[in-house]
Amino acid sequence: MAVPGAVTSLELDGVAAGHGVLLPGDNLQRMAELPAASFQLAYLDPPFNTGERQTGGHARAVRVGDGDAAGRPGFQGRAYTLTAGPQSSYGDRFDDYRAFLLPRLEAAWRLLHPTGTLYLHLDYREAHYAKVWMDELVGRDRFLNEIIWAYDFGGRTRRRWPPKHQTILVYVKDLRAYYFDSDEVDREPYMAPGLVGPEKAARGKLPTDVWWHTIVATSGRERTGYPTQKPVGILRRIVTASSRPGDWVLDPFAGSGTTGAAAAELGRRFALIDENPEAVAVMRRRLGEALQPEA
């Protein structure tokens, strides 16, 4: 019997490229409603198990009068103040993180197409454990990459090396058949362009497994106000490399909807899942007409 409100394969077929569905609710239940092998790409950005409640917001920069001591210096020496907007939050503490994450990895893997790729985004707290769990779940021979997203922004401790990176583990359904489009991926400048010749230097190089990309600025235009928002540039690269226009992209921890924003921009179809009403509200505002009416 079909689950009420389920997205069936027929409904998936009826979604146009550049559009998608938003599925509020528990991602384990919602993924069980979706047809197997339907998604070319699955991107999972679960809570990192930091032990804290994650809170985010959006700050708007407002210019103040010249010489105002209350302002902070900004572009061209002008003074600005930051006005805080509404805040969103979610819990990020688990007594048994493996029991939480493993069933969701298994559910996402079931939905992956035979040529598909799964990206699992974590940080130093759980990434190494998750690698072992994924190897046990799908096999070490399906591991493709460990991507390091490096950035240089935010607070710094003086008692250890400041953590300024996150880890993205990449697994494929079949190492002989997975889809990867290196030609369409954004390219990076060579570190020593004089060694490669002018034509290659002008074209740039395929990114390695270390990605330098700034975080989403508190007062930036991209900022939605939802905590731990990922930059659209990171998702744009993932979606471009591991899916084609018209393919389905899954994000079961959708949060601020960055995966949907990148997928819509690139002409992919997407399914976003989140049980946090604040995340659902943010995604409805952010994605607007790119969302199909909910079932």
Residue ranges of model-derived segments:
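Core catalytic lobe of class I
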Residues: 1-293
